[in-house]
């Protein structure tokens, strides 16, 4: 496995942490639900979060490809800076409880009876905005962007699925830790892009 593929896998894991944290919160709020309900919720979390996290970096990549022509010499600094800012934002959110606030604002009491697709869509978009910004940096990695976005989607879907079950069994105490890990990985990749691209 080459270094670029390792970078994409690390980027995918870091970007998946927002969706993972939200999935843990959704799972924790579904602790009294039936196994069939939790399975449906886990499948929907995987689908919504995976698709959103796969499409948004592709949009960022395409926009970045246009901008790189104009900003070629500054691109590594801009791309690395974006990743560092996103990582710092994730750390800030982890230490200020913003994931819990998103869940509380978007949580519909009816989710206990039926999965709210509008809420799932909103959460998927909210957790994937960072992925669109990170997609810009895919232009700086020597890897097929389509493959990278597919890897990001698959990794996020897996984290979304298992996050529901982890939240159901352990509660919300892991949410912030997932955000911290994701933030640190994004900062590390950002520094690498700035220094070695």
From Swiss-Prot:
Residues spanning the membrane: 8-28, 43-63, 66-86, 123-143, 146-166, 177-197
GO cellular component: plasma membrane
Annotated InterPro entries: Mntp/YtaF, Put_MntP
Localisation: Cell inner membrane
Membrane topology label: Multi-pass membrane protein
Main location: membrane
Keyword terms of this UniProt record: Cell inner membrane, Cell membrane, Ion transport, Manganese, Membrane, Transmembrane, Transmembrane helix, Transport
Family under the similarity heading: Belongs to the MntP (TC 9.B.29) family.
Chain's role: Probably functions as a manganese efflux pump.
UniProt name for this protein: Putative manganese efflux pump MntP
Species the sequence originates in: Psychrobacter arcticus (strain DSM 17307 / VKM B-2377 / 273-4)
Encoding gene, per UniProt annotation: mntP
């Amino acid at each position: 496995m080459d270094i670029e593929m390792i970078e994409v896998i690390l980027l995918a894991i870091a970007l998946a942490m927002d969706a993972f944290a939200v999935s843990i919160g959704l799972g924790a709020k579904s602790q009294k639900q039936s196994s069939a309900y939790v399975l449906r919720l886990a499948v929907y979390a995987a689908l919504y979060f995976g698709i959103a996290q796969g499409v948004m970096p592709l949009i960022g990549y395409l926009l970045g490809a246009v901008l790189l022509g104009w900003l070629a010499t500054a691109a590594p600094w801009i791309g690395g800076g974006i990743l560092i800012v996103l990582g710092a934002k994730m750390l800030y959110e982890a230490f200020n409880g913003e994931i819990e606030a998103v869940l509380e604002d978007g949580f519909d009491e009816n989710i206990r009876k039926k999965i709210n697709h509008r809420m799932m869509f909103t959460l998927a978009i909210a957790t994937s905005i960072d992925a669109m910004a990170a997609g810009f940096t895919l232009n700086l990695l020597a890897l097929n962007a389509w493959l990278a976005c597919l890897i990001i989607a698959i990794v996020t879907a897996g984290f979304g699925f298992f996050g529901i079950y982890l939240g159901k069994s352990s509660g919300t105490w892991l949410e912030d830790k997932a955000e911290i890990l994701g933030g640190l990985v994004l900062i590390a990749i950002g520094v690498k892009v700035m220094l070695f691209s």
